[in-house]
Protein backbone atom coordinates (compact mmCIF):
# COMPACT_ATOMS: atom_id res chain seq x y z
CA UNK A 1 0.00 0.00 0.00
CA UNK A 2 1.22 3.49 -0.84
CA UNK A 3 0.20 5.23 2.36
CA UNK A 4 0.38 8.81 1.05
CA UNK A 5 -1.61 8.15 -2.12
CA UNK A 6 -4.22 6.17 -0.18
CA UNK A 7 -4.45 8.74 2.64
CA UNK A 8 -7.66 10.44 1.36
CA UNK A 9 -9.50 7.11 1.25
CA UNK A 10 -8.09 6.19 4.67
CA UNK A 11 -9.45 9.45 6.09
CA UNK A 12 -12.86 8.66 4.61
CA UNK A 13 -12.70 5.33 6.45
CA UNK A 14 -12.13 6.94 9.88
CA UNK A 15 -15.78 7.12 11.03
CA UNK A 16 -16.43 3.54 9.93
CA UNK A 17 -13.37 2.17 11.74
CA UNK A 18 -14.16 4.10 14.92
CA UNK A 19 -17.75 2.88 14.85
CA UNK A 20 -16.72 -0.75 14.30
CA UNK A 21 -14.24 -0.69 17.20
CA UNK A 22 -16.63 1.17 19.53
CA UNK A 23 -19.53 -1.20 18.88
CA UNK A 24 -17.24 -4.20 19.36
CA UNK A 25 -16.00 -3.11 22.79
CA UNK A 26 -19.40 -1.83 23.92
CA UNK A 27 -20.87 -5.24 23.09
CA UNK A 28 -18.32 -6.89 25.38
CA UNK A 29 -19.17 -4.49 28.18
CA UNK A 30 -22.93 -4.84 27.73
CA UNK A 31 -22.77 -8.64 27.68
CA UNK A 32 -20.67 -8.63 30.87
CA UNK A 33 -23.13 -6.22 32.51
CA UNK A 34 -26.10 -8.44 31.65
CA UNK A 35 -24.21 -11.37 33.18
CA UNK A 36 -23.72 -9.49 36.45
CA UNK A 37 -20.40 -7.65 36.00
CA UNK A 38 -20.86 -3.86 36.47
CA UNK A 39 -17.18 -3.00 35.83
CA UNK A 40 -17.51 -1.79 32.24
CA UNK A 41 -20.62 0.24 33.01
CA UNK A 42 -19.05 1.90 36.06
CA UNK A 43 -16.06 2.92 33.91
CA UNK A 44 -18.29 4.34 31.17
CA UNK A 45 -17.23 1.74 28.62
CA UNK A 46 -20.72 0.78 27.45
CA UNK A 47 -20.82 3.65 25.00
CA UNK A 48 -20.33 4.37 21.30
CA UNK A 49 -18.07 7.30 22.17
CA UNK A 50 -14.84 6.28 20.37
CA UNK A 51 -12.64 8.24 22.79
CA UNK A 52 -13.51 5.78 25.56
CA UNK A 53 -12.25 2.83 23.50
CA UNK A 54 -9.42 4.48 21.56
CA UNK A 55 -6.09 2.68 21.23
CA UNK A 56 -3.69 4.54 18.91
CA UNK A 57 -1.69 1.55 17.67
CA UNK A 58 -4.75 -0.63 17.19
CA UNK A 59 -6.52 2.15 15.30
CA UNK A 60 -3.57 2.83 12.97
CA UNK A 61 -3.10 -0.89 12.39
CA UNK A 62 -6.77 -1.22 11.44
CA UNK A 63 -6.42 1.57 8.88
CA UNK A 64 -3.13 0.49 7.34
CA UNK A 65 -3.08 -3.30 7.73
CA UNK A 66 -6.85 -3.92 8.14
CA UNK A 67 -6.08 -5.72 11.42
CA UNK A 68 -6.69 -3.72 14.56
CA UNK A 69 -8.05 -3.48 18.07
CA UNK A 70 -9.41 -1.05 20.65
CA UNK A 71 -8.66 -0.62 24.34
CA UNK A 72 -9.92 -3.84 25.98
CA UNK A 73 -12.99 -3.59 28.19
CA UNK A 74 -12.12 -4.68 31.76
CA UNK A 75 -13.99 -7.79 32.88
CA UNK A 76 -14.20 -9.06 36.47
CA UNK A 77 -15.06 -12.76 36.42
CA UNK A 78 -15.88 -12.91 40.13
CA UNK A 79 -19.31 -11.52 39.26
CA UNK A 80 -20.04 -14.40 36.88
CA UNK A 81 -22.12 -17.36 38.03
CA UNK A 82 -20.46 -19.68 35.51
CA UNK A 83 -17.13 -18.03 34.63
CA UNK A 84 -16.12 -20.21 31.65
CA UNK A 85 -19.54 -20.02 30.02
CA UNK A 86 -19.97 -16.32 30.75
CA UNK A 87 -16.48 -15.47 29.48
CA UNK A 88 -17.39 -17.24 26.24
CA UNK A 89 -20.61 -15.23 25.92
CA UNK A 90 -18.76 -11.96 26.56
CA UNK A 91 -16.08 -12.98 24.06
CA UNK A 92 -18.63 -13.85 21.37
CA UNK A 93 -20.54 -10.58 21.84
CA UNK A 94 -17.84 -8.48 20.16
CA UNK A 95 -17.51 -10.42 16.87
CA UNK A 96 -21.28 -10.93 16.71
CA UNK A 97 -21.85 -7.18 16.98
CA UNK A 98 -19.48 -6.62 14.04
CA UNK A 99 -21.24 -9.27 11.97
CA UNK A 100 -24.55 -7.50 12.66
CA UNK A 101 -23.02 -4.17 11.60
CA UNK A 102 -21.67 -5.75 8.41
CA UNK A 103 -25.12 -7.12 7.56
CA UNK A 104 -26.75 -3.71 8.22
CA UNK A 105 -24.23 -2.00 5.93
CA UNK A 106 -24.79 -4.68 3.30
CA UNK A 107 -28.57 -4.19 3.39
CA UNK A 108 -28.14 -0.41 3.09
CA UNK A 109 -25.73 -0.91 0.19
CA UNK A 110 -28.21 -3.24 -1.47
CA UNK A 111 -30.96 -0.61 -1.19
CA UNK A 112 -28.70 2.12 -2.58
CA UNK A 113 -27.60 -0.08 -5.49
CA UNK A 114 -31.23 -0.94 -6.26
CA UNK A 115 -31.99 2.75 -6.84
CA UNK A 116 -28.70 3.25 -8.71
CA UNK A 117 -29.59 0.39 -11.04
CA UNK A 118 -33.06 1.82 -11.68
CA UNK A 119 -31.57 5.26 -12.36
CA UNK A 120 -29.11 3.70 -14.81
CA UNK A 121 -31.88 1.86 -16.66
CA UNK A 122 -33.95 5.06 -16.85
CA UNK A 123 -30.91 7.11 -17.96
CA UNK A 124 -31.20 9.32 -14.87
CA UNK A 125 -27.94 8.37 -13.16
CA UNK A 126 -26.58 11.58 -11.59
CA UNK A 127 -23.41 13.24 -12.82
CA UNK A 128 -20.78 15.63 -11.48
CA UNK A 129 -21.11 16.40 -7.76
CA UNK A 130 -24.05 14.07 -7.13
CA UNK A 131 -22.21 11.16 -8.70
CA UNK A 132 -19.33 11.88 -6.33
CA UNK A 133 -21.68 11.99 -3.32
CA UNK A 134 -23.23 8.70 -4.41
CA UNK A 135 -19.77 7.19 -4.83
CA UNK A 136 -18.84 8.32 -1.31
CA UNK A 137 -21.95 6.70 0.17
CA UNK A 138 -21.27 3.43 -1.64
CA UNK A 139 -17.60 3.46 -0.59
CA UNK A 140 -18.39 4.10 3.09
CA UNK A 141 -21.00 1.33 3.14
CA UNK A 142 -18.57 -1.08 1.50
CA UNK A 143 -15.84 -0.19 4.01
CA UNK A 144 -18.41 -0.77 6.76
CA UNK A 145 -18.95 -4.29 5.43
CA UNK A 146 -15.25 -5.07 4.97
CA UNK A 147 -13.95 -3.59 8.23
CA UNK A 148 -16.58 -5.27 10.38
CA UNK A 149 -16.05 -8.65 8.74
CA UNK A 150 -12.28 -8.32 9.18
CA UNK A 151 -12.70 -7.34 12.84
CA UNK A 152 -15.03 -10.28 13.46
CA UNK A 153 -12.75 -12.83 11.75
CA UNK A 154 -9.60 -11.49 13.42
CA UNK A 155 -11.16 -11.65 16.88
CA UNK A 156 -12.51 -15.17 16.37
CA UNK A 157 -8.97 -16.58 16.14
CA UNK A 158 -8.93 -19.10 19.03
CA UNK A 159 -5.72 -17.89 20.65
CA UNK A 160 -5.21 -15.33 23.41
CA UNK A 161 -5.75 -12.43 23.65
CA UNK A 162 -8.43 -12.68 20.94
CA UNK A 163 -12.11 -13.23 21.71
CA UNK A 164 -12.04 -16.62 20.03
CA UNK A 165 -9.84 -17.97 22.81
CA UNK A 166 -12.60 -17.29 25.37
CA UNK A 167 -15.08 -19.20 23.23
CA UNK A 168 -12.60 -22.03 22.60
CA UNK A 169 -11.75 -22.42 26.30
CA UNK A 170 -15.42 -22.85 27.20
CA UNK A 171 -15.51 -26.12 25.25
CA UNK A 172 -12.24 -27.54 26.56
CA UNK A 173 -12.38 -30.35 29.16
CA UNK A 174 -11.46 -29.10 32.62
CA UNK A 175 -8.14 -31.00 32.70
CA UNK A 176 -7.05 -29.48 29.37
CA UNK A 177 -8.26 -25.99 30.20
CA UNK A 178 -5.63 -25.24 32.85
CA UNK A 179 -2.90 -26.84 30.74
CA UNK A 180 -3.68 -24.57 27.81
CA UNK A 181 -3.93 -21.53 30.09
CA UNK A 182 -0.45 -22.31 31.42
CA UNK A 183 1.08 -22.10 27.96
CA UNK A 184 -1.17 -19.48 26.36
CA UNK A 185 1.63 -16.90 26.06
CA UNK A 186 3.80 -19.34 24.11
CA UNK A 187 0.83 -20.32 21.94
CA UNK A 188 0.18 -16.65 21.17
CA UNK A 189 3.84 -15.99 20.25
CA UNK A 190 3.89 -19.08 18.03
CA UNK A 191 0.74 -18.02 16.20
CA UNK A 192 2.06 -14.48 15.68
CA UNK A 193 5.27 -15.89 14.17
CA UNK A 194 3.17 -18.19 11.97
CA UNK A 195 0.95 -15.31 10.83
CA UNK A 196 3.86 -13.06 9.86
CA UNK A 197 5.65 -16.01 8.28
CA UNK A 198 2.64 -16.67 6.04
CA UNK A 199 2.41 -12.96 5.22
CA UNK A 200 6.09 -12.94 4.25
CA UNK A 201 5.41 -15.82 1.86
CA UNK A 202 2.57 -13.85 0.30
CA UNK A 203 -0.16 -15.91 1.96
CA UNK A 204 -3.07 -14.15 3.65
CA UNK A 205 -5.58 -16.66 5.05
CA UNK A 206 -7.60 -13.96 6.84
CA UNK A 207 -7.87 -11.95 3.63
CA UNK A 208 -8.98 -15.04 1.73
CA UNK A 209 -11.73 -15.72 4.28
CA UNK A 210 -12.77 -12.05 4.16
CA UNK A 211 -13.07 -12.08 0.36
CA UNK A 212 -14.97 -15.36 0.43
CA UNK A 213 -17.48 -13.99 2.95
CA UNK A 214 -17.97 -10.67 1.15
CA UNK A 215 -18.44 -12.40 -2.21
CA UNK A 216 -20.88 -14.82 -0.60
CA UNK A 217 -22.90 -11.99 0.95
CA UNK A 218 -22.97 -10.16 -2.38
CA UNK A 219 -24.30 -13.28 -4.11
CA UNK A 220 -26.99 -13.77 -1.46
CA UNK A 221 -28.23 -10.21 -2.03
CA UNK A 222 -28.17 -10.51 -5.81
CA UNK A 223 -24.95 -8.58 -6.39
CA UNK A 224 -22.80 -11.53 -7.40
CA UNK A 225 -20.28 -11.68 -10.22
CA UNK A 226 -21.55 -10.70 -13.66
CA UNK A 227 -24.61 -8.75 -12.48
CA UNK A 228 -25.28 -5.23 -13.69
CA UNK A 229 -25.49 -3.92 -10.12
CA UNK A 230 -22.01 -5.25 -9.35
CA UNK A 231 -20.73 -3.52 -12.47
CA UNK A 232 -22.30 -0.24 -11.36
CA UNK A 233 -20.90 -0.75 -7.86
CA UNK A 234 -17.38 -1.14 -9.27
CA UNK A 235 -17.93 1.88 -11.52
CA UNK A 236 -18.84 4.09 -8.54
CA UNK A 237 -15.79 2.93 -6.57
CA UNK A 238 -13.51 3.55 -9.55
CA UNK A 239 -15.06 7.01 -10.03
CA UNK A 240 -14.20 7.90 -6.43
CA UNK A 241 -10.73 6.42 -6.77
CA UNK A 242 -10.05 8.45 -9.90
CA UNK A 243 -11.08 11.66 -8.14
CA UNK A 244 -8.85 10.89 -5.15
CA UNK A 245 -5.76 9.92 -7.09
CA UNK A 246 -6.09 12.73 -9.64
CA UNK A 247 -6.44 15.22 -6.81
What are these regions, as identified by a protein language model?
Residues 1-247:
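Hydrophobic transmembrane alpha-helices and their immediate loop junctions
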Amino acid sequence: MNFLSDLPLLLLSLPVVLMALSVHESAHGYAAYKLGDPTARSLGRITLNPIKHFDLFGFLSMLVFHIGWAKPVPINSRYFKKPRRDFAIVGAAGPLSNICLAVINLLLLRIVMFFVNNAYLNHTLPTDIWLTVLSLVVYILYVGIAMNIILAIFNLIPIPPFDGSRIFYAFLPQKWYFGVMRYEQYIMIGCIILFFGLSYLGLNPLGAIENWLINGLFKITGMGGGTQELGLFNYLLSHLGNLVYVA
